[in-house]
Amino acid sequence: MIKIALCAAILAIAYAEEGTVYLFDPTGKSGVSGNVRFLQLPNGINVVGEIRGLPPGKHGFHIHQEGNISPSCLAAGGHFNPKKKLHGGPDDSVDHRHIGDLGNIEADENGIAFFNFIDSIISFKGETNIIGRSVVVHEKEDDLGKGGHPDSLQTGNAGGRLACGVIGVKTIC
């Protein structure tokens, strides 16, 4: 009984402290895969990851509305946008971006993207809670809503979806 109570207490703490996601292509076509951790810090969420199998260059990286990634990441829906704002970049204010707009990650010549940044808008609670939502890596660079393309203010004109996964809670029990 003590072990159950201890695990419940740890789960409550972990829920507020760390999320994790394994990214992959559910269709198996792109070969893209990787891991991303979301760590609560005093000034926001630290997003740390490694993704392999990408074409070299920049790729849009977003949190999407739904936690459903079947059959080909399309069920993830649009960018996480509870405030109903236009698309923007991670440096834009909450009034000028979707909550899920995390900008771009960049793959090197070997197709590997390492990244480590802090986002002050996403969270593990309330209206901006990312737990149970999906992360999507896109085929093209996100123009951060400034590209002038008809899709710029909705998707950043980042193209198709190469890999996705659902953000879960990391626990030690």
Feature locations, PLM:
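N-terminal leader/targeting pre-sequences
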Residues: 2-173
